Amino acid sequence: MKNQTTKNIILVFVGLALLSGFVYLKWDNFTDVGTNLINLKNSHPTQMVSYDTFLHYLENGAIKKVDLYENAELAVFDAFESLDQNLLKPVPLLSSDTLFGILNSDEFRPIGVKIPVRNSSLILTLRDYKIDFTAYPIVNFDSIWPILSVLLIPVLLIVVYRLFFSEGSNYDFFGNLRKARAKIQLDADTGVLFSDVAGIDEAKQEFEEFVSFLKMPQLFTAVGANPPKGVIIVGPPGTGKTLLAKAIAGEAGVPFISISGSEFVEMFVGIGASRVRDLFETAERNSPCILFIDEIDAIGRQRGTGVGGTNDEREQTLNQILTEMDGFKPTSGIIVIAATNRADVLDSALLRPGRFDRQITVYLPNIYGRIEILKVHSRNKNIDSKTSLKFIAQRTAGFSGADLANILNEAAILTARANLETITIKQIYTAIERIIAGLEGVLLNDSRNKRLVAYHEVGHALTGTLLKNHDDVQKVTLIPRGRAQGLTWFTPDEQPLMTRGQLSSRLIGTLGGRAAEKVIFGKMEITSGASNDFFKVNSLARQMVTRFGMSSLTPMAMELPKPTIFFGRSVQTRPDCFLDIADKIDLQIIEMVEDGFEKACITLERNRLLLDQLATLLTQIETIDGKEFEQFVSTYTGLPKKPQLKIVKAKENKNKVKAPV
């Protein structure tokens, strides 16, 4: 307290010294201001008379003094009563208010007169009558602003010190900046259990021992086992990483502390590290608990990857996280869970044992996982009993849990919009198509464009149906959605491994739309509707050549895995292959695409009658279901059998080689 009083006294003296110094340096401005204020007071007459009256007063000796203002354009004079009462009227004796306050005066009010422009004889006239006169400069307040601006500097310095930097201040500027902007959520009970998490059973089994540790840590410590300090959940967006972390806290009955990785990053140096300390202090006060950091890649990126390897605020924040996790005691009861979909960019020091001990990957759900997820999200929705969740799961391959929840929510909105009581399969299908392709557009009325689109879409579907390695047709429609004038849906194979035959069939089927346009209408009538198809074909062919080794060029991959996308590293990477090899790769891609396009054209030319009838049918009914499409095709030609995995027999070697002993 005594030290604070001493500081305040010193601060007062410093402030007074600053003010005195500024006043001394600007004294000339103060004197100018004082003169201007006096001139301003006297230059405001309370009564104005004409110039003739002024001359009349002057000739009769009723004026004793004249003050000239505004470059002699205004004259203010004091008049007294003349002996001749008929000639002059006395000036009334009144009290007046000056410009800046209250001034009670016993003198006559000053009388003013406007002097005609360029009246050079006035000065001579005043001298002839021996009248005292004084000429004043124009009142100028420009000299006030430098004084105010200069005085403002020490005042602001004192205020800033008192508010932000003094001890005992009620307003901690940087403390509030550190804490107020960091949104740390503390939930005593998340209300989420493992039963609310579906489709990721493998990940749930891994987390069961975390729940056991939080409930009964003595079981681990009794046998000398150190509980895990942290775990990173890796997976695509919408796969339930945050929900899984909440379920762990809910099952264990411990507080759930969550924060986003972007909350640590600020423009002020040291703020991120300070927030990390505050976060772990909060966790220690509420232990045992779950500490969840979402999108940890915002602060956990590899260090030294910027241009020049400079150290920035993000690296300081990461260093603080590493230090805090090293400081955990075995019995602290804090488990740090982080979530990211970019595990490849994380720093290696963050992933070592003792910090984040485990890395659990959450994949997109398979058909059985999607069924379980649909069951969870359909609990509070009135879905028609005839609606098959398995059928919906078959139509939603590659969808995440968040996507499935969004589908049911969109279907519920469509049901309410149609004033229906239950959600039917029709609303669910419409919701799926809206999410994938966009809003439904207006049907084409032009018969020519409608036939062009019909042949294009039937070309995709028919080519895919007649290829034995292609996915099954799900739906063909002329109803526009988004930018597409028509759509052909296939049910993708969920197997993680793709054969060369499957990829080649997909390439040919994608080119089936342009092939149908060429076969039916000729080269001059091909449309721009295949632009997106060519983009997909080029990407697929390049992967087959450079990544999968499925070309005649070489059985090896000619494209290295892309490093983490950092500017500092990208400018140093060398090309994956020589320029002459790159030219050969481009030629191989062109050859594969041209070969696929030729095969698509041959397939459609051999089935020209079937192509015409399907296009006519699609033009009439506008939508054909996948099963109906296959039945229609099977009446004209046999459908290919799905390939079975065959083992190539070994060639008999005439030169028998003895086995080594």
From Swiss-Prot:
- GO biological processes: protein catabolic process; proteolysis
Q: Where in the cell does this protein reside?
A: Plastid, Chloroplast thylakoid membrane
Write the record's keywords in alphabetical order, separated by commas: ATP-binding, Chloroplast, Hydrolase, Membrane, Metal-binding, Metalloprotease, Nucleotide-binding, Plastid, Protease, Thylakoid, Transmembrane, Transmembrane helix, Zinc
Sites binding ATP sit at G235, P236, P237, G238, T239, G240, K241, T242
Superkingdom of this protein's organism: Eukaryota
GO CC, alphabetical: chloroplast thylakoid membrane
Q: What does the entry comment about cofactor binding?
A: Binds 1 zinc ion per subunit.
Matching entries from PANTHER family are given as: ATP-DEPENDENT ZINC METALLOPROTEASE FTSH 2, CHLOROPLASTIC (PTHR23076:SF139), METALLOPROTEASE M41 FTSH (PTHR23076)
Its family? Answer: In the central section; belongs to the AAA ATPase family.
NCBIfam families membership: FtsH_fam (TIGR01241)
Q: What is this protein called?
A: ATP-dependent zinc metalloprotease FtsH
What lineage does UniProt assign to this protein's organism?
Eukaryota, Sar, Stramenopiles, Ochrophyta, PX clade
The UniProt gene name for this protein comes to: ftsH
